Regions:
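Walker B catalytic acidic pair
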Residues: 118
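Active-site-proximal or metal-binding-adjacent scaffold patches in catalytic folds
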Residues: 1-113, 122-155
Length: 155
């Protein structure tokens, strides 16, 4: 007996569409940690083919941002001047990744698009090993993939 594999691209688009319809009346969405982790796994399977390892996710008040993707490494264990602090030192020091999300979003779609946006930065760090992981051509290469799933990739 053959097992049927779900088409993850189609199921993600349908899941986002259904969740958006279910939550369209909510004006101020407050995400919880289990919801953020669940949607991280869903978006990881649908947008990134499951290539991301789940980082620490923090939900709290952020000044001026809806989300951040952080790469933390312990520079106390490496000699000063070993690498530029503005460039992520892949292979030189162990790196811990974290995604920080604001505790309140104007709508549910803003929450999902912010989480997916930060996941693109995480993909740049974990898979592409982009030394800057900013809004460059690697970042915008995901725009068409977002569009097929009914999401928008903002700066």
């Amino acid at each position: 007996m053959k097992k049927r594999r779900k088409n993850t691209k189609k199921s993600l688009k349908i899941r986002v569409k259904n969740a958006l319809k279910k939550r369209e009346h909510i004006k101020a969405y407050r995400p919880s940690l289990p919801v953020a982790q669940s949607w991280f796994r869903t978006l990881n399977r649908g947008l990134f083919s499951g290539r991301l390892t789940e980082p620490h996710i923090h939900i709290g008040r952020l000044m001026g941002d809806w989300g951040r993707c952080c790469a933390n490494w312990d520079n106390r264990k490496t000699r000063r001047g070993t690498y530029d602090q503005r460039v992520i030192p892949y292979g030189k020091a162990p790196i811990d990744y974290a995604i920080e999300l604001h505790s309140k979003f104007p709508s549910w779609k803003d929450f999902i698009e912010t989480l997916a946006h930060e996941m693109v930065h995480l993909y740049q760090m974990q898979v592409m090993e982009d030394p800057y992981s900013n809004h460059n051509e690697n970042f915008y290469s995901f725009k068409s993939r977002f569009k097929t799933h009914g999401l928008t990739l903002y700066r």
